[in-house]
Amino acid sequence: MVEEQLSLSGVEEIAPKIETPKIEKRTVKERRQQVLTVLIHMLHSERGMERMTTARLAKEVGVSEAALYRYFPSKTKMFEALIEHIESTLLSRITASMRNETQTMNRIHDILQTILDFARKNPGLTRVLTGHALMFEEAQLQARVAQFFDRLEMQFVNILQMRKLREGRAFNVDERIIASHLVTLCEGQFMRYVRTNFRLNSSQSFEQQWRFIEPLFA
């Protein structure tokens, strides 16, 4: 018996449907983080001291300027986000240091070391703290940085004032004056980093600098 073969003429051959893999879009939060990461990298680069334009930033991120403004309404908001990141990071590390160390002198030592290490490892953010990255930006950003240093100084004041309660010893100098000096030391080191284009590692000489501070705790 010969099997009848069906003719395929005039019949379309249907190829199996192949699903195109979907490319997951980044969330707004992820895009915002990407923009900030690229901005930090640009601030750290050789052109980090130049005026930061949205055109340059958009090109590095790989989006249009219009798309950039979907994630941040203005360049000022981008820098504000960076300053908030610096503030939250350093203050949380200070809090952690306070949990790990109870002796006031050691607390101050560890906190100063933490701050200088952060500045050394994050040149782009250090340029924000010194104001060099903000020279062509809105004046409110300089005020925001000043607010950060005020909060840092208050942290030092609180730690120093707790010494009398925790250790039964007071300072011969007003705690606010000492705190102001500690913040000035940090700001000076930040400026030194930027001035030398981060060639000098000031944290290597921190222990020598600490010798001038240590007598305050005697």
UniProtKB/Swiss-Prot annotation:
Source species: Haemophilus influenzae (strain ATCC 51907 / DSM 11121 / KW20 / Rd)
Location of this chain's protein in the cell: Cytoplasm, Nucleoid
Family indicated by similarity: Belongs to the nucleoid occlusion factor SlmA family.
GO biological process, one term: regulation of DNA-templated transcription
Protein name, entry field: Nucleoid occlusion factor SlmA
Primary localization class, coarse: cytoplasm
Biological role stated in the UniProt entry: Required for nucleoid occlusion (NO) phenomenon, which prevents Z-ring formation and cell division over the nucleoid. Acts as a DNA-associated cell division inhibitor that binds simultaneously chromosomal DNA and FtsZ, and disrupts the assembly of FtsZ polymers. SlmA-DNA-binding sequences (SBS) are dispersed on non-Ter regions of the chromosome, preventing FtsZ polymerization at these regions.
Example GO molecular function: transcription cis-regulatory region binding
Primary gene name: slmA
GO CC annotation, single: bacterial nucleoid
Keywords: Cell cycle, Cell division, Cytoplasm, DNA-binding
Lineage of the organism: Bacteria, Pseudomonadati, Pseudomonadota, Gammaproteobacteria, Pasteurellales
